[in-house]
Amino acid sequence: MNERNELLVCRRAKDPAKGTLDLPGGFIDMAETGEEGVTREVKEETGMEVEKAEYLFSLPNIYVYSGFTVHTLDQFFRCSVTDTLHYKAMDDAADVFFLPLKDIHTEDFGLGSIRKGLEIFLKEKEK
């Protein structure tokens, strides 16, 4: 999130759900904590440096890729970055931009677990 109450989102460059919206993220590497993984993934996909990663919640997920079904645990974090003005789409992201919370439509996000996570996040923001 930036100071204008906008959420950083990506457009997926690859399948599954190529071309749809997503949140920066990915799989955790072996021996990596959730905080380390989200910090690395945000840098790989946006070039942004995470200074703080605050764990919010997790959701069980089934992820199908290349014909394989993988059971995962999706972890959601609120991240603070050192600079919200300089970023670029890299790695798995075709585009990256800030989207005002009021303009977020969960159906624009291609992965069901991300849609569900956003619904939880947005409900909490309304409180």
Give the role of each language-model region.
Residues 59-86, 125:
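Active-site-adjacent beta-strand/loop module that shapes the phosphate/pyrophosphate-binding cleft
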Residues 1-22, 50, 81:
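N-terminal strand-loop-strand
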